[in-house]
């Protein structure tokens, strides 16, 4: 199920980050278990009830329910054509 976990992590990182998704770089901080519900970080997240209310309010105000989080800039994950950043 390693391929399935990698597939769900890749799919979920494209979309909105929710509490039950497992990201591969989380394994550095906590003990790396295959089940994300057993990890220490996940239990710390559920202790605070997931997304706090003011964060949800900021989310809906800034992007109106879009899937991109509001800490991304306008060109956060967008690719530019053949225009280079440094010349």
From Swiss-Prot:
Motif Antp-type hexapeptide, residue range(s) on this chain: 22-27
Entry's Gene Ontology molecular function annotations: DNA binding; DNA-binding transcription factor activity
UniProt KW DNA-binding keyword: yes
InterPro entries (alphabetical): Homeobox_Antennapedia_CS (IPR001827)
Keyword annotations of the record: Activator, Developmental protein, DNA-binding, Homeobox, Nucleus, Repressor, Transcription, Transcription regulation
The keyword Nucleus appears for this protein: yes
Location in the cell: Nucleus
Family, similarity comment: Belongs to the Antp homeobox family.
Cellular component GO terms, alphabetical: nucleus
Role noted for this protein: Sequence-specific transcription factor which is part of a developmental regulatory system that provides cells with specific positional identities on the anterior-posterior axis. Binds the consensus region 5'-TTAAT[GT][GA]-3'. This homeotic protein controls development of the cells in the posterior thoracic and first abdominal segments. It activates the synthesis of the decapentaplegic (DPP) growth factor.
Listed name of the protein: Homeotic protein ultrabithorax
Tissue: In the embryo, expression is seen in the epidermis, somatic and visceral mesoderm, and the peripheral and central nervous system.
């Amino acid at each position: 199920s390693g391929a399935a976990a990698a597939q769900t992590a890749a799919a979920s990182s494209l979309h909105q980050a929710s509490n039950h998704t497992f990201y591969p770089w989380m394994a550095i901080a906590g003990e790396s278990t295959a089940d994300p519900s057993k990890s220490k970080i996940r239990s710390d997240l559920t202790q605070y009830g997931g997304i706090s209310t003011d964060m949800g309010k900021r989310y809906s105000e800034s992007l109106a329910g879009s899937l991109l989080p509001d800490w991304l800039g306008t060109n956060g994950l967008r690719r530019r054509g053949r225009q280079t950043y440094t010349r």
